Amino acid sequence: AGQFERADKITTDNRVLFHRVANTLNYLDIRTVVVSCGTCYDQLQGYRFEDIFPGCRIVDIHEYLLEKGVTLPDQGAGYLYHDPCHSPMKLQEPMKTVQALLGPHVLKNDRCCGESGTLGVTRPDIATQVRFRKEESIRSGEAALRARMAQAGAPAAADVKILTSCPSCLQGLKRYEDDLSSGLLEADYIVVEMARRLLGEDWLPAYVARANAGGIERVLV
C-alpha cells in the first residue's frame, strides 16, 4: 500500500530544491543538516545530501546538542520519556542520550501513545484502546518517578512532564492532558524543555526576534 509514484516525485522535487539552496548558498560551507524528526531523518537519508552539500552529514538535534556539550544542569528535575517508534537518535541507545541531556532522573515510559502517524485519525476506535493502556503506563510511571525522586532526596514536583522527540507522538500525548488530572500530564519536546530551562520562558519570541534581525539566511528558490 502507499502512493509510491507520488512519494518519488515529492522526493525528486525536494532534492531539486536542496540543489537550488546549495547553489544559492555556495559561499557557505554547509557541513551539517540537523533533523528533529525520526521519520524525516530516515527519509532524508535517501536524498544523498553528500552529493548536494559536499562533505555534509545528517544528525539528530538531540545528538547534535550532546555533541556540542549543551545539557541541563542537574537540579533534581525528573521526567518521563516516551521513546517513539521512529526514534531520530541513531548513535547510541536513545535513553543514554536523553539522560545525558536531561539528567539522571528520567524514566522511560513504555507502550505506544496511540497516534502512530495517522492511526489516531483514521482508526480512532483502535487508537482509543491503545491510549487506555498507555494511560495506565503513564500513571504507573508517574508513581515510579516520584518514588525515585523521593529516594534520591530531590524536591517533589507538583507536575510531572512527559517528553518525547517525535511530532506525531507529541500530538498523541497531548490528548492525555485533559484525562489525567493528578498533576500529570504536560507533554512537550525534549529540546523545548531544554530551551525553556536554559534560556527562559521567553526563549521563542527572543529567538524569532534574533532571526528576523539577521540571524538566518533567507533563500528564494
Question: What are these language model-derived features?
Answer:
Residues 1-221:
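Iron-sulfur cluster-binding electron-transfer modules in prokaryotic oxidoreductases
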